[in-house]
A protein has these predicted regions:
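The feature captures the beta-strand-to-loop junction immediately N-terminal to the Walker
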Residues: 46-48
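Helix-to-loop junction immediately C-terminal to a conserved catalytic motif
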Residues: 61
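Conserved ABC ATPase signature
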Residues: 134-138, 142
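Hydrophobic anchor residue at the start of the ABC signature
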Residues: 148-149
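A short, proline-enriched helix->beta-strand linker immediately N-terminal to the Walker B motif
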Residues: 153-157
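Helical segment within the ABC ATPase nucleotide-binding domain
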Residues: 173-185
Length: 251
């Protein structure tokens, strides 16, 4: 029954940002920023704290107002209603079961929860059998897996991730990185991270945001598909190049 509930992956759409300008507290954060992320690709977004990474994700998500037609999908249509978001904190409601947390979006929209789909995702993230548990019974890594399942439950083609694994221990983080790369392979993903190795393991493109107003430095493209092995020579080489770019942007 669970396998039958597995839907086709969402149709890949890219992210297009044109002439984005944003002023916050008399500071020009972005001035005519332009970029495109192809559908089905993952871009890692890095840069110093306060440079505007989270502000950019909030604009794309529609949480911070922007001028009309500044942000769109590669199909020319608005991205509203086609985005899922995953942050650093799992934001699980402690009084709801794990499964109820995963299906919360449907309930808030007054839709019937898709129980089989939720069960399938719980199994995919290694939480089979804990759907009836409260979040307090889960470890930090298990809670973040539940948050990943909740993100996937929405079946949105674009996923925005703001340091989703930074609070986890090294071993748990490596496992969930690999899991998320596999489960999000059909989605368009923008990932904020401060970890060069994580960026090189999980993304197709590396973008460093720097300056005031903020702009993208020369991007780095990575060969092959995520997740990449941490000891892959190409990953190590890309990590070194990325770190040099980050250090240069801080001077």
């Amino acid at each position: 029954m669970i396998a039958a509930a597995t839907p086709a992956p969402p149709a890949a759409i890219g992210i297009v940002v044109r002439d984005l300008t944003l002023r916050l507290n008399n500071r020009v954060l972005f001035d005519k920023l332009n970029f495109t992320l192809d559908g089905g690709q993952c871009a890692a977004l890095l840069g110093a704290s306060g440079v505007g990474k989270t502000s950019l994700l909030k604009i794309i998500a529609g949480l911070t107002p922007a001028d009309a037609d500044t942000v769109s999908g590669s199909d020319g249509l608005p991205l509203a209603g086609r985005i899922a978001y995953m942050g650093q904190k799992d934001l699980l409601y402690p009084w709801l079961t794990v499964k109820q947390n995963i299906t919360l979006g449907a309930r808030l929209r007054r839709e019937k929860a898709e129980s089989d789909w939720a069960d399938y995702l719980l199994a995919e993230v290694g939480l089979d059998g804990v759907g009836a548990c409260l979040p307090a019974a889960l470890s930090g890594g298990m809670r973040q897996r539940a948050a990943l399942a909740r993100t996937l439950y929405e079946r949105q083609p674009v996923v925005l991730m703001d340091e989703p694994f930074s609070a986890l221990d090294t071993l748990t983080r490596a496992k969930i990185q690999a899991l998320s790369a596999r489960l999000l392979s059909a989605h368009t993903v923008m990932l904020i991270t401060h970890d060069p190795l994580e960026a090189c393991r999980l993304s197709h493109r590396l973008w460093v945001l720097a300056g005031q107003p903020a702009r993208f430095l020369t991007g780095l493209d990575l060969a092959g598909e995520p997740p990449r092995a941490p000891d892959d020579p190409a990953v190590q080489q890309s990590q070194g190049a990325l770190l040099r770019q980050l250090l240069g942007s801080a001077e």
